[in-house]
Design a protein with these regions (language model features):
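A polyanion-binding, active-site-adjacent surface
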Residues: 1-177
Protein backbone atom coordinates (compact mmCIF):
# COMPACT_ATOMS: atom_id res chain seq x y z
CA UNK A 1 0.00 0.00 0.00
CA UNK A 2 1.23 3.48 -0.88
CA UNK A 3 -0.91 6.43 0.19
CA UNK A 4 -0.62 10.18 0.47
CA UNK A 5 -3.17 12.86 1.24
CA UNK A 6 -2.03 14.67 -1.91
CA UNK A 7 -2.63 11.87 -4.42
CA UNK A 8 -5.69 12.48 -6.55
CA UNK A 9 -5.58 9.11 -8.26
CA UNK A 10 -5.79 5.72 -6.57
CA UNK A 11 -5.05 2.34 -8.08
CA UNK A 12 -7.34 -0.12 -6.35
CA UNK A 13 -6.37 -3.67 -7.20
CA UNK A 14 -6.82 -7.13 -5.76
CA UNK A 15 -3.86 -8.09 -3.54
CA UNK A 16 -0.10 -8.50 -3.89
CA UNK A 17 0.96 -11.41 -6.10
CA UNK A 18 3.99 -13.64 -5.62
CA UNK A 19 6.54 -11.26 -7.18
CA UNK A 20 5.18 -8.28 -5.32
CA UNK A 21 5.16 -10.31 -2.13
CA UNK A 22 8.86 -11.09 -2.65
CA UNK A 23 9.92 -7.48 -3.40
CA UNK A 24 7.40 -5.44 -1.43
CA UNK A 25 6.91 -3.21 -4.48
CA UNK A 26 3.36 -3.16 -5.91
CA UNK A 27 3.01 -3.92 -9.62
CA UNK A 28 6.72 -4.82 -9.83
CA UNK A 29 6.05 -7.44 -12.49
CA UNK A 30 4.91 -7.74 -16.13
CA UNK A 31 1.35 -6.82 -15.10
CA UNK A 32 2.71 -3.58 -13.68
CA UNK A 33 4.61 -2.90 -16.89
CA UNK A 34 1.39 -3.32 -18.84
CA UNK A 35 -0.58 -1.15 -16.39
CA UNK A 36 2.01 1.65 -16.65
CA UNK A 37 1.79 1.42 -20.45
CA UNK A 38 -2.00 1.61 -20.27
CA UNK A 39 -1.68 4.68 -18.04
CA UNK A 40 1.15 6.19 -20.12
CA UNK A 41 3.32 6.89 -17.06
CA UNK A 42 6.92 6.18 -16.16
CA UNK A 43 7.94 3.96 -13.24
CA UNK A 44 9.07 7.11 -11.43
CA UNK A 45 5.66 8.77 -11.74
CA UNK A 46 3.83 5.51 -11.03
CA UNK A 47 5.62 5.10 -7.70
CA UNK A 48 5.34 8.78 -6.69
CA UNK A 49 2.80 8.31 -3.92
CA UNK A 50 2.20 12.06 -3.74
CA UNK A 51 0.57 11.65 -7.16
CA UNK A 52 -0.68 8.06 -7.30
CA UNK A 53 -1.94 6.08 -4.31
CA UNK A 54 -1.95 2.29 -4.46
CA UNK A 55 -4.48 0.57 -2.21
CA UNK A 56 -5.17 -3.12 -2.88
CA UNK A 57 -8.25 -4.83 -1.50
CA UNK A 58 -5.95 -7.17 0.42
CA UNK A 59 -2.72 -5.94 1.96
CA UNK A 60 -0.97 -9.32 2.02
CA UNK A 61 -0.37 -12.13 -0.46
CA UNK A 62 -3.41 -14.42 -0.06
CA UNK A 63 -1.68 -17.60 -1.27
CA UNK A 64 -2.28 -19.84 -4.27
CA UNK A 65 -5.09 -22.22 -5.12
CA UNK A 66 -4.64 -25.73 -6.53
CA UNK A 67 -4.25 -24.31 -10.05
CA UNK A 68 -1.42 -22.01 -8.85
CA UNK A 69 -3.55 -18.88 -9.30
CA UNK A 70 -3.78 -16.26 -6.56
CA UNK A 71 -6.52 -16.76 -4.01
CA UNK A 72 -9.04 -13.93 -3.48
CA UNK A 73 -7.93 -11.07 -1.23
CA UNK A 74 -8.57 -11.65 2.44
CA UNK A 75 -11.72 -9.88 3.64
CA UNK A 76 -10.31 -8.60 6.90
CA UNK A 77 -8.26 -5.85 5.22
CA UNK A 78 -11.31 -4.35 3.58
CA UNK A 79 -13.46 -4.81 6.65
CA UNK A 80 -10.92 -3.30 9.04
CA UNK A 81 -9.22 -0.60 7.00
CA UNK A 82 -10.77 0.46 3.72
CA UNK A 83 -13.74 2.57 4.77
CA UNK A 84 -11.68 4.54 7.28
CA UNK A 85 -8.76 4.90 4.90
CA UNK A 86 -10.86 6.23 2.03
CA UNK A 87 -12.62 8.63 4.40
CA UNK A 88 -9.16 10.20 4.91
CA UNK A 89 -8.66 10.72 1.17
CA UNK A 90 -11.30 13.29 0.14
CA UNK A 91 -8.97 14.77 -2.48
CA UNK A 92 -9.28 11.71 -4.76
CA UNK A 93 -10.67 12.56 -8.18
CA UNK A 94 -10.31 9.15 -9.81
CA UNK A 95 -10.29 5.51 -8.73
CA UNK A 96 -8.81 2.99 -11.14
CA UNK A 97 -10.60 -0.18 -10.03
CA UNK A 98 -8.63 -3.17 -11.27
CA UNK A 99 -10.52 -6.44 -11.12
CA UNK A 100 -13.89 -7.44 -9.73
CA UNK A 101 -13.07 -7.30 -6.01
CA UNK A 102 -12.03 -3.65 -6.23
CA UNK A 103 -14.88 -2.83 -8.59
CA UNK A 104 -17.51 -4.35 -6.32
CA UNK A 105 -16.18 -2.47 -3.29
CA UNK A 106 -15.73 0.96 -4.85
CA UNK A 107 -18.97 1.05 -6.83
CA UNK A 108 -20.90 -0.01 -3.71
CA UNK A 109 -19.04 2.57 -1.60
CA UNK A 110 -20.21 5.28 -4.01
CA UNK A 111 -23.80 4.05 -3.89
CA UNK A 112 -23.74 2.25 -7.25
CA UNK A 113 -23.47 -1.47 -6.40
CA UNK A 114 -22.78 -3.70 -9.37
CA UNK A 115 -25.22 -6.46 -10.23
CA UNK A 116 -23.73 -9.87 -9.37
CA UNK A 117 -24.52 -10.94 -12.94
CA UNK A 118 -22.55 -8.07 -14.52
CA UNK A 119 -19.73 -9.26 -16.75
CA UNK A 120 -16.31 -7.68 -17.00
CA UNK A 121 -17.20 -6.39 -20.46
CA UNK A 122 -20.36 -4.76 -19.10
CA UNK A 123 -18.57 -3.15 -16.16
CA UNK A 124 -15.56 -1.88 -18.11
CA UNK A 125 -17.73 -0.95 -21.09
CA UNK A 126 -19.93 1.35 -19.00
CA UNK A 127 -17.05 3.80 -18.59
CA UNK A 128 -19.09 6.82 -19.69
CA UNK A 129 -21.56 6.54 -16.81
CA UNK A 130 -18.72 5.87 -14.34
CA UNK A 131 -17.20 9.21 -15.34
CA UNK A 132 -20.20 10.94 -13.71
CA UNK A 133 -19.39 9.54 -10.26
CA UNK A 134 -17.47 11.47 -7.61
CA UNK A 135 -14.74 10.42 -7.54
CA UNK A 136 -14.79 9.03 -11.06
CA UNK A 137 -14.16 5.31 -11.46
CA UNK A 138 -12.38 3.65 -14.35
CA UNK A 139 -12.91 -0.10 -14.22
CA UNK A 140 -10.15 -2.19 -15.77
CA UNK A 141 -9.45 -5.86 -16.25
CA UNK A 142 -6.37 -7.07 -14.43
CA UNK A 143 -3.38 -6.29 -16.67
CA UNK A 144 -2.20 -9.91 -16.45
CA UNK A 145 -1.37 -11.99 -19.52
CA UNK A 146 -4.31 -14.16 -18.45
CA UNK A 147 -6.61 -11.45 -19.82
CA UNK A 148 -5.00 -11.26 -23.28
CA UNK A 149 -7.95 -13.13 -24.80
CA UNK A 150 -10.46 -10.76 -23.21
CA UNK A 151 -8.51 -7.72 -24.43
CA UNK A 152 -8.27 -9.09 -27.99
CA UNK A 153 -11.96 -9.99 -27.95
CA UNK A 154 -12.97 -6.49 -26.83
CA UNK A 155 -11.12 -4.06 -29.13
CA UNK A 156 -13.21 -1.16 -27.82
CA UNK A 157 -11.19 -1.44 -24.59
CA UNK A 158 -8.00 -0.20 -26.24
CA UNK A 159 -9.86 2.16 -28.58
CA UNK A 160 -12.15 3.86 -26.03
CA UNK A 161 -11.25 3.03 -22.44
CA UNK A 162 -7.47 3.38 -22.55
CA UNK A 163 -7.58 6.92 -24.01
CA UNK A 164 -10.03 7.87 -21.23
CA UNK A 165 -7.75 6.26 -18.64
CA UNK A 166 -4.74 8.18 -19.97
CA UNK A 167 -6.66 11.46 -19.89
CA UNK A 168 -7.83 10.86 -16.30
CA UNK A 169 -4.32 9.91 -15.19
CA UNK A 170 -2.77 12.95 -16.89
CA UNK A 171 -5.30 15.28 -15.28
CA UNK A 172 -4.96 13.73 -11.82
CA UNK A 173 -1.17 13.84 -11.72
CA UNK A 174 -0.72 17.20 -13.48
CA UNK A 175 -1.47 19.26 -10.37
CA UNK A 176 1.94 18.43 -8.90
CA UNK A 177 3.77 19.76 -11.93
CA UNK A 178 2.30 23.22 -11.30
CA UNK A 179 1.97 23.07 -7.51
Amino acid sequence: MRVSTTARLVLAGQAPGTRVNATGIPYNDPSGDRLRAWMNVSRETFYDESRIAIVPMGFCFPGLNAQKADLPPRRECRQLWHDGLFDLLPQLTCIVAIGRYAQDYHFARLGRPLPKSATLAEIVGDWKSHARLTPRIIALPHPSWRNNGWIKGNPWFEEKVLPRLRAEVAEAIAWKAIA
